A protein has these predicted regions:
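Flexible "arm" and connector segments at domain edges
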Residues: 1-62, 68-205, 210-272
């Protein structure tokens, strides 16, 4: 692998390249924080895909794209005389040192769980830091990830089930309430009744999903990763179903559910 000097040279190289692009390229020159934001989200999702697929070469490329965006935002901040890349890095370094007193000072921790609790506690005491436990969870996060992060933040200050097994009563309770509202929605007569029942059912569905996320978290599972794996599995099997149907000269719309299930089970048996 590369030496520290080579790493610093590479970092200096990208800084020089971006300086030149910002000055001489019409597209790069007109970019703003706002115009870059959707592209940044896309790059992060592409990075996530590379991680999930275990493609190391692709991971290296996608990390570079994300790094470019970090440096780009810092360059824009520098042009506005608000901050530059040195401020960004120093702020990060100071934060890491402050939040790891068990590494850089004399504090002691018993394990990873204590580190997380210490991290959350220190965040609330920082100057200009997040003074509320949940203020560090962005509103723009996807709902599943947001639920997980909110629950994890609350856990960091002790707001959690005493025993993980207790969560199942809550899951069953929320599932029952959701089913009851679905029944009420089916029995509704007027449009107003249907609208009100739909709203209540949606609310209870949210509670049920939130409780399910909690159950996953308490057992050390990441629901976002789990659902991503299931989506990938569904894609593989459905693609197999489509391909086999085409090979037979048929169309999915013309097949019975039993016929599709049979091909689906074939794909499942093949480990797809």
């Amino acid at each position: 692998m590369h030496t520290r000097e080579e790493k610093l040279q590479a970092f200096g190289r990208i800084l020089d390249i971006l300086d030149e692009l910002r000055e001489k390229c019409p597209w790069d020159r007109k970019q703003t924080n706002e115009s870059l934001r959707p592209q940044t989200l896309e790059e992060v999702y592409e990075l996530s895909d590379a991680i999930l697929k275990g493609e190391e070469r692709e991971l290296s490329k996608e990390l570079g794209d994300v790094l470019l965006h970090v440096i780009f935002y810092a360059k824009i901040g520098e042009e506005k005389q608000h901050f530059d890349i040195v401020d960004v890095i120093n702020f990060l370094c100071d934060k890491l040192i402050y939040r790891h007193p068990h590494v850089f000072s004399t504090a002691e921790v018993g394990g990873a769980e204590d580190v997380i609790k210490q991290w959350e506690m220190l965040k609330t005491t920082e100057k200009d830091g997040n003074k509320r436990v949940l203020s560090g969870v962005p509103d723009g996060l996807p709902p599943l990830l947001k639920a997980y992060r909110m629950q994890d933040k609350a856990r960091g200050v002790g707001f959690d089930w005493e025993k993980k097994e207790q969560v199942w009563d809550k899951v069953k309770e929320e599932m029952g309430e959701y089913q009851a509202e679905l029944d009420a929605m089916a029995a509704a007569q007027t449009e107003d009744e249907k609208a009100a029942a739909y709203d209540r059912a949606e609310d209870e569905l949210g509670d049920f999903l939130f409780a399910t996320v909690n159950a996953a978290r308490l057992y050390g599972l990441n629901p976002d990763t789990a659902l991503e794996r299931t989506c990938a599995k569904f894609r593989r099997r459905f693609t197999y179903l489509e391909e086999q149907t085409i090979r037979k000269g048929r169309n999915l719309k013309d097949m019975t559910l039993a016929e599709m299930d049979a091909i689906w089970d074939e794909g499942k048996a093949k480990g797809l």
